[in-house]
Curated annotation (Swiss-Prot):
It comes from the Bacteria. One of its GO terms (molecular function) is RNA binding. Involved in transcription antitermination. Required for transcription of ribosomal RNA (rRNA) genes. Binds specifically to the boxA antiterminator sequence of the ribosomal RNA (rrn) operons. HAMAP family: NusB. Gene3D superfamilies: NusB-like (1.10.940.10). This is Transcription antitermination protein NusB. InterPro entries: NusB-like_sf, NusB_fam, NusB_RsmB_TIM44. Keywords: RNA-binding, Transcription, Transcription antitermination, Transcription regulation.
Amino acid sequence: MGKYRKKAREIVFRTLYTYDIKGGDLFEIMEDHIKDIRGKLSKKTVDYIYSILKGIDEHLPEIDDILRENLKNWRLERLGYPERALLRLGVYELLFSDIEDKGRVFMDILDLTKCYIDNPDTVKFINGVLSTVYKNRQKVNQ
């Protein structure tokens, strides 16, 4: 059921990574990423990609502020491009999206981390930061 979301998250991750390196328009970058596979993507997947990117685009300064507040002994600007992209995606989906299955968000982000970075310490780092962000927000909302 949620495979379209996992594929969408991967495309959003790649879009955010490219955006961080080159700048530009998030939606143009995303369209460039999917131009060769668009016909193979379901409408649901493409709609979800647009939904996530729209939300990240609207909330990026706030997402970055949240990350800065929750990074221990790291500066956001010093993180690698893939780590920053994964954390931005994770924070958006955990705190700003209306998706109910937050556990699935964690699992997909960590799977992407393993796939694209393949460093156990980075997987722990991403998990730790996202867990801290999510727990801190839960405390505020209680």
